[in-house]
From Swiss-Prot:
<dbReference type="Pfam" id="PF07286">
    <property type="entry name" value="D-Glu_cyclase"/>
</dbReference>
<dbReference type="GO" id="GO:0016829">
    <property type="term" value="F:lyase activity"/>
</dbReference>
<dbReference type="InterPro" id="IPR016938">
    <property type="entry name" value="UPF0317"/>
</dbReference>
<dbReference type="InterPro" id="IPR009906">
    <property type="entry name" value="D-Glu_cyclase"/>
</dbReference>
<keyword id="KW-0456">Lyase</keyword>
<dbReference type="InterPro" id="IPR038021">
    <property type="entry name" value="Putative_hydro-lyase"/>
</dbReference>
<protein>
    <recommendedName>
        <fullName>Putative hydro-lyase BAD_0077</fullName>
        <ecNumber>4.2.1.-</ecNumber>
    </recommendedName>
</protein>
<comment type="similarity">
    <text>Belongs to the D-glutamate cyclase family.</text>
</comment>
Length: 270
């Protein structure tokens, strides 16, 4: 499980920070989750694979748009994403995960030593993008106000397989006051490129979650009296696919430690 956000108070990064400031801080070695940073800009998950396995994953993402909404697919060996001019995909994420044959072998803040000319990067939308619009509408996002990472869970929801890749869906959860659940569904639904509307509202057991207080990734949830658990498809699903499908080599972001793009969130609003 990824560590929580105990160091969030040690940095000046916050809602008013620019994507460039955040990426520079991560490039310099700052490690912390990215929720609550760079208001108004889209955040993204990463999946990096050898070219020989990239088509299968591209097909997997297209068949499973809800958890894997593609914002950009980079050419083999390219490290400068179109979604963030001036960025380096190898250094500008606070924490990466390195996988070999489905096993996690390292968590590092810089992947230059692992980089290869055949690696293809997939930039995948993240629900952190619509958290600021939720808060602007008066819907509380409790893990941000508590200084925690968002809780994420493995589920029983089957993804559609593609080539070598198969998985169940991973979801993120936010406790929403019962009177504001409809607002949360409506607002997040405006952002289909960053997971869109929830996949489940209410009973966690309906999607195979036994105990919401013990997430598989991220931090334990913050739930207030009257809150309803609301679950969104999550871009950690590709990591579940890596563990299930066991590709020879892969690199991902660490859950909650996203790539902050230079794209405005409004560009992904419908």
């Amino acid at each position: 499980m990824v560590d929580g956000m105990s160091d969030m108070g040690t940095t000046e990064l916050g809602a008013a920070s620019t994507p460039e400031q955040a990426r520079a801080a991560f490039r310099d070695g700052l490690v912390r989750p990215t929720c609550g940073i760079a208001q108004g800009y889209a955040q993204a998950n990463l999946m990096i694979l050898p070219k020989e396995q990239a088509f299968d994953f591209l097909l997997f993402a297209q068949r499973n748009h809800k958890p894997c909404p593609l914002l950009e697919v980079m050419e083999p060996g390219v490290t400068a994403p179109v979604t963030a001019p001036g960025a380096d995909i190898r250094t500008d994420v606070p924490l990466y995960r390195v996988w070999k044959r489905g096993e996690l072998v390292a968590e590092v803040p810089d992947i230059r030593e692992y980089w290869r000319s055949d690696l293809v990067t997939f930039v995948i939308g993240c629900s952190f993008t619509f958290e600021f619009p939720l808060m602007e509408a008066g819907v509380p996002v409790r893990h941000i106000t508590a200084g925690r990472n968002v809780p994420m869970y493995d589920t029983s929801i089957e993804c559609r397989s593609a080539g070598a890749f198969h998985s169940t869906m991973v979801v993120s959860m936010r406790g929403i006051p019962s009177t504001q659940v409809a607002d949360a569904c409506r607002i997040s639904g405006y952002y289909p490129s960053v997971h869109g509307a929830p996949v489940c509202v209410g009973d966690p057991s309906a999607i195979g979650i036994d105990d919401i207080m013990h997430p598989d990734y991220g931090d334990a949830p913050v739930l207030e009296p009257g809150d309803v658990p609301v679950f969104w498809a999550c871009g950690v699903t590709p990591q579940a696919a890596v563990m299930a499908s066991k590709p020879e080599f892969a690199i991902t972001h660490a859950p909650g430690h996203m790539f902050i793009t230079s794209k405005r969130d409004l560009e992904y609003m419908v």
